[in-house]
A protein has these predicted regions:
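N-terminal strand-loop element at the rim of the active site
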Residues: 5-62
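Short hydrophobic beta-strand element within catalytic cores of glycosyltransferases
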Residues: 245-248
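Short His-centered aromatic/hydrophobic patch
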Residues: 58-62, 79-86, 98-99
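Donor nucleotide-sugar binding/catalytic pocket of nucleotide-sugar-dependent glycosyltransferases
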Residues: 110-143
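Conserved acidic donor-binding segment of nucleotide-sugar-dependent glycosyltransferases
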Residues: 260-269, 276-283
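Aromatic "clamp/platform" in nucleotide-sugar-dependent glycosyltransferases that forms part
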Residues: 209, 228
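A conserved mid-protein helix/loop that constitutes part of the nucleotide-sugar donor-binding site
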Residues: 13-21, 155-174, 182, 186-193, ...
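Acidic anion/phosphate-binding donor-loop and adjacent secondary structure
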Residues: 131-152, 215, 303, 320
């Protein structure tokens, strides 16, 4: 198969890593190309065509560039990620992925088949043209992983309103020990000010984002997710794969992955109580998440999830050839 992935983005986070890993795994047995912004070209292992997909969605230049590129490539399968590219692209065999939860899914409904990060992602999509595709772990990124003596609790993610990192800072206490928050985004300066205002500058530390998630997880007591909205967060699976327990708000598919006792309602008070309950009991937290560790290691691997996507592609190609 000749497969073309398209995305638009200004940061390299969960969606972008999803596209990178999926395209690379597919490239081992198929011809795969990715179209995306120039700034991410060096991060992709599959063949990459740089087009400024971040420009205005109604830009005539963008439409012309995409049309010409698709005509040259002549792909069997076109797979768009996110709402913008999905709304722009027209193709005979058009697959799309909803990576979070969307109020307006009209653009996705126009594609032949839709993958969703969680059941919530697909609530407005007919079942016959969709499937849940949970996120995965690229095992090759963790070949050298070794668990070390825990030093901190860990947040990994964008500093954006939807991730609500302020909720975590407000829930924290100097009695809980070190909290390392790794990421970047529009809220970064606001977070630093909030940390200072709450007198937590010697307890909460902000660090720039890194691709080496394994090194961060190797010294973590637990991963903490404070989001208002999620799809199927990649770092959730990576943490469980590394046998690092997770505390999180109830968003996306998190309640389908973690035990109820590890999940807070999506409000500040419930989240604060969850942190207080478990911060000194991470050994017990690990114990109750043993089944989660095992499930991720047996089912949520890149190779397994990629094969599900490829099989769905083949089904549609077979129908199209009849």
């Amino acid at each position: 198969m000749k497969i073309l992935h398209l995305f638009s983005s200004k940061v390299f986070a969960g969606l972008e890593r999803h596209v990178e890993e999926l395209s690379y795994e597919q490239s081992k047995s198929h011809q795969v190309l990715v179209i995306g912004p120039e700034r991410f070209k060096d991060k992709f292992r599959a063949e990459y065509i740089a087009i400024n997909t971040n420009q205005w969605r109604y830009s005539p230049l963008l439409w012309l560039e995409l049309r010409d590129a698709m005509a040259r490539i002549n792909p069997d399968i076109v797979h768009t990620h996110g709402q913008k590219m999905t709304s722009i692209i027209k193709a005979d065999l058009h697959f799309s992925t909803i990576h979070g939860t969307k109020k307006n899914v009209a653009a996705f409904k126009k594609s032949q088949f839709i993958f969703g990060a969680s059941k919530k992602s697909l609530e407005q999509i007919p079942q016959q043209k969709s499937m849940v595709l949970e996120n995965w772990v690229d095992e090759s990124r963790f070949n050298d992983f070794q668990q070390k003596t825990p030093e901190y609790f860990l947040y990994v993610g964008r500093f954006e309103p939807v991730k609500n990192p302020q909720r975590l800072i407000r829930a924290w206490s100097s009695d809980y020990g070190k909290l390392l928050m790794v990421g970047s985004g529009q809220l970064e300066e606001d977070l630093k000010k909030l940390i200072a205002e709450l007198g937590l500058s010697k307890t909460i530390f902000i660090q720039s984002e890194t691709n080496d998630v394994g090194s961060l997880l190797s010294k973590a007591h637990a991963l903490i997710i404070s989001s208002d909205r999620e799809g199927s967060p990649k770092v959730l699976y990576e943490s469980l794969y590394c046998k690092v327990p997770v505390l999180a708000t109830n968003c996306g598919n998190i309640s389908e992955v973690l035990p109820k006792t590890s999940v807070a309602e999506n409000n500040d008070e419930s989240f604060k109580m969850l942190i207080k309950k478990w911060v000194g009991k991470t050994d017990k937290l690990s114990s109750i998440q043993q089944d989660c560790f095992g499930k991720v290691m047996s089912k949520n691997l890149l190779s397994i999830q990629t094969e599900k996507v490829n099989i769905k592609y083949q089904e549609f190609l077979s129908m199209a050839s009849k």
